[in-house]
């Protein structure tokens, strides 16, 4: 049986777009192994949202002149690519940008949507320099991962301009390893992982999802016979939840619109289905982060339920044993 050190992770700094994490203790060499793996997953394999096509009234292609604006169409498109969007519903769709008159146009001028949130509304897009200027733009928003080059086909309508899309929500990842000792053991090390995001995902959520991807990929390498034996030996544990609470629609929990949309997109419509998923599986849902999880846990507590009923049952059993033991001693 392996006697390798089992590490723990702690977040030592976080501001929504930046997170610093320390993983320790690790056997010598594991810091680089883990750091490299997490870095590659973070930068390349997390889902994100990006603008993929643009339609501008009066503009046929990217080399057309943009009337009554200081920027040309190419510069405008380059600025549009920097808009960072979070999908609240987990769906693709269209955003609309409308402006008129002489003004500085920013991402804040994009019309509000129930399905999307622009996380950098202060982003500069262009300047209209005439009082009679009118700008109408449609932005196609898609889900994906990594980077995708512009896609133009014979069926692309005239006036639709494809743009290269950067889906990854991660801007930068750094990691370092440091030597450490625990007691007399001096051959251990710690991993320091720094993550910068674009604001559409929290650093802690990004690290959690990346680790989950790695676990699922490595699970395929586990002995097939061992997996089958464990599955056959395990029996499902059922927890008694009143039927009226089990079948309660998630809307009755008074969750935020964002949390409800994330759950419904994953096919979760009742409180019972939420509890069946559990904490770990919920955190793998698209756009369902730690804030949504905390909100959900708080709402469940108000109706006397928990995302981890097995832990509560264990605690109740332990408390009961201690109580009975105290009575016996008395």
Curated annotation (Swiss-Prot):
Residues 1-225 are annotated as: Alpha N-terminal domain (alpha-NTD). GO terms for cellular component: cytoplasm; DNA-directed RNA polymerase complex. SMART domains: RPOLD. Keywords: DNA-directed RNA polymerase, Nucleotidyltransferase, Transcription, Transferase. GO terms for biological process: DNA-templated transcription. The keyword Magnesium does not apply. Its EC number is 2.7.7.6. It holds the Pfam family RNA_pol_A_CTD. One of its GO terms (molecular function) is DNA binding. It catalyses: RNA(n) + a ribonucleoside 5'-triphosphate = RNA(n+1) + diphosphate. Residues 237-330 are annotated as: Alpha C-terminal domain (alpha-CTD). InterPro entries: DNA-dir_RNA_pol_insert, DNA-dir_RNA_pol_RpoA/D/Rpb3, DNA-dir_RpoA, RBP11-like, RNAP_asu_C, RNApol_insert_sf. The keyword Zinc does not apply. Homodimer. The RNAP catalytic core consists of 2 alpha, 1 beta, 1 beta' and 1 omega subunit. When a sigma factor is associated with the core the holoenzyme is formed, which can initiate transcription. Belongs to the RNA polymerase alpha chain family. DNA-dependent RNA polymerase catalyzes the transcription of DNA into RNA using the four ribonucleoside triphosphates as substrates. This is DNA-directed RNA polymerase subunit alpha. It comes from Dehalococcoides mccartyi (strain ATCC BAA-2266 / KCTC 15142 / 195) (Dehalococcoides ethenogenes (strain 195)). The lineage of its organism: Bacteria, Bacillati, Chloroflexota, Dehalococcoidia, Dehalococcoidales. The gene is rpoA.
């Amino acid at each position: 049986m392996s006697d390798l050190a089992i590490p723990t992770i702690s977040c030592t700094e976080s501001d929504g777009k930046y997170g610093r994490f320390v993983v320790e203790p690790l056997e010598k060499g594991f810091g680089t192994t883990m750091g490299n793996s997490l870095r590659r997953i973070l930068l390349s394999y997390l889902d994100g949202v990006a603008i993929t096509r643009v339609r501008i009234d009066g503009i046929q292609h990217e080399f057309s002149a943009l009337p009554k604006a200081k920027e040309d169409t190419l510069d405008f498109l380059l600025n549009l690519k920097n808009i960072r969007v979070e999908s609240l519903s987990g769906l693709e769709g269209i955003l609309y940008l409308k402006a008129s008159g002489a003004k500085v146009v920013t991402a804040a001028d994009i019309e509000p949507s129930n399905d999307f949130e622009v996380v950098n509304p202060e982003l500069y897009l262009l300047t209209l320099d005439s009082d009679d200027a009118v700008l109408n733009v449609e932005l196609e928003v898609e889900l994906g991962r990594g980077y995708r080059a512009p896609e133009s086909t014979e069926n692309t309508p005239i006036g639709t301009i494809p743009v290269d899309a950067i889906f990854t929500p991660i801007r930068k990842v750094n990691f370092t390893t440091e030597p450490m000792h625990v007691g007399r053991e001096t051959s251990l090390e710690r991993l320091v992982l720094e993550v910068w995001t674009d604001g559409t995902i929290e650093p802690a959520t990004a690290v959690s999802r990346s680790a989950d991807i790695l676990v699922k990929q490595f699970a395929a390498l586990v002995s097939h016979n061992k997996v089958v034996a464990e599955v056959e030996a395990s029996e499902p544990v059922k927890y008694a939840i009143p039927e009226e609470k089990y079948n309660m629609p998630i809307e009755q929990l008074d969750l935020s619109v964002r949390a409800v949309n994330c759950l419904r997109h994953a096919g979760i419509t009742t409180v019972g289905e939420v509890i069946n998923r559990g904490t770990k599986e919920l955190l793998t849902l698209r756009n369902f982060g730690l804030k949504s999880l905390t909100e959900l846990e708080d709402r469940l507590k108000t109706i006397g339920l928990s995302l981890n009923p097995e832990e509560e049952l264990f605690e109740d059993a332990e408390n009961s044993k201690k109580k009975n033991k105290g009575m016996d001693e008395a």
